[in-house]
Amino acid sequence: MFDIGWTELLVIAVVLIVVVGPKDLPPMLRAFGKMTQRARKVAGEFRAQFDEALREAELDDVRQTISDAQKLNPVSSLREAMNPLRQMGNEIKADLQKATAVTENKTEVPSAAMSAPTPSMSLPETPPVVPTPAPAPEPAAVAAETVAAKPKAPRKPRAKAADKAAFAIAAPVENPPAEKPKRTTAARKPAAPKTPVQTKKKKDEA
């Protein structure tokens, strides 16, 4: 342990016997033995603690390696690599859907314009109110009111009546009736030559 040989141990024992004496040497050896035992125990405990620390460090290292191995899962790395590709695919799909929706709307607009709206034949819940005509005034009363409202015209002198008669007689003379258009006579047929018998008869009649 201390790299001491037999000769060195004998020298130490002789020195102790001379210094301590033969009476006090046995209890001193016992105390020395107890001290060595305690030192061994302390060394053993220190060694045990050191070993436990090493084991814990190794376990920590092992745990770290295990956690690193779990983190280095190829599935998760592949998923992370595929995420941008999925996003690009989703964007392309969204653009295609928008384009198809726009074309469908364009095709639906003319078809909707061509289709005539169907008239609604629903009847009203309440019947329409027909306005009642106001009672017309009686014709006799109306005539009486008009007669009462019109003032009587003053009588004209008789001289004016005579002038009117003369004017009525002179009017047709001044404005003669328009001549009637002559009727167009049809083309006369040429007269047949008179026979001597007819000429004789005419002379006799004359």
UniProtKB/Swiss-Prot annotation:
Region described as Disordered: 104-206
GO biological process entries: protein transport by the Tat complex
Domain of life: Bacteria
Keyword annotations from UniProtKB, A to Z: Cell inner membrane, Cell membrane, Membrane, Protein transport, Translocation, Transmembrane, Transmembrane helix, Transport
Cellular localization per UniProt: Cell inner membrane
Complex formation: The Tat system comprises two distinct complexes: a TatABC complex, containing multiple copies of TatA, TatB and TatC subunits, and a separate TatA complex, containing only TatA subunits. Substrates initially bind to the TatABC complex, which probably triggers association of the separate TatA complex to form the active translocon.
Protein name: Sec-independent protein translocase protein TatB
Organism of this sequence: Rhizobium etli (strain ATCC 51251 / DSM 11541 / JCM 21823 / NBRC 15573 / CFN 42)
